[in-house]
Amino acid sequence: AIYEVSGENFNVLSPKQLGVVLFEKLGLPAGRKTKSGYSTDAEVLENLVSAHPVVPLVLQYRAFTKLKSTYVDGLLKLSDENGFIHTTLNQTVTVTGRISSAEPNLQNIPVRTELGRVMRKVFVPRDGEHLLVDADYSQIELRVLAHMADEKNMIDAFLKGEDIHARTAAEVYGVPLDEVTPQMRSSAKAVNFGIVYGISDFGLAKNIGVSRKEAREFIEKYFARYPRIKEYMDSCVRQGHEQGYVTTLFGRRRNLPELSSSNYQTRSFGERAAMNTPIQGTAADIIKIAMVRVADALRREGLEAKL
């Protein structure tokens, strides 16, 4: 279909050949040009989706190719003679203490797209007598943040079972909860999660498609509505500078030598780490404790189940 629509026979996965076809043969408006030719990365192509019918086909082809190479071919290589896949779960590879998965990474199986969800169907129980069960905490990092910062507005929203992103949008935009639009909620969601990761106005602006000034104002409004969160974040950075480390709620430390760097970017990274490590690390601690308790309960009850 790509060859028919473009009128050219070429290697779709070659950025150089694709650039020539799109920008020279078809005359589409060229974006950035690199030393090796025209840039054909996802951002450039997304901006050209409506310019020519071949562009969405190329994006779709790339998505299919990635899914096949990473998940179909990749998982087949790692499955044993009985069709089982055994991942490696790492306890202490990530700096925040989150569990990570490798060979294959089973924490990264796609779910956002329809085709990605099909990939999940390859994981099935060993027989008709067994089930695969999964469980997850709802908004655990934001709940941890609300607790550690003792932010009453956010705690109140969680205790009432409200949609935290809609509640944040209502707080920041100054509108009743039932007047929050999907766009408002989407922006508030980006800020809620961004705060956990120490997002900057530049990063937020890019995420939600607004100017840097608007993003800065949004963050300022957020902290005005949730003042204890700002105080808590500042106290984490102070602790990092004074002690050289920050801790989770359970006392697990992360050393932050970056905070004493003379390089501004390195120091800024250290400050973001000081803000997000106690939150992400505490959430990781809670999940690990829960996993141990579940495993103990399964053994104690003599259930034919594995965690």
Predicted regions and their residues:
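Conserved "right-hand" nucleotidyltransferase catalytic core of DNA-directed polymerases
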Residues: 1-114, 124-131, 138-141, 201, ...
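Flexible glycine/proline-rich, aromatic-decorated loop/lid segments
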Residues: 111-116, 160-167, 259-263
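Mixed-charge, glycine-rich, non-catalytic linkers/tails in nucleic-acid processing enzymes
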Residues: 1-9, 149-159, 302
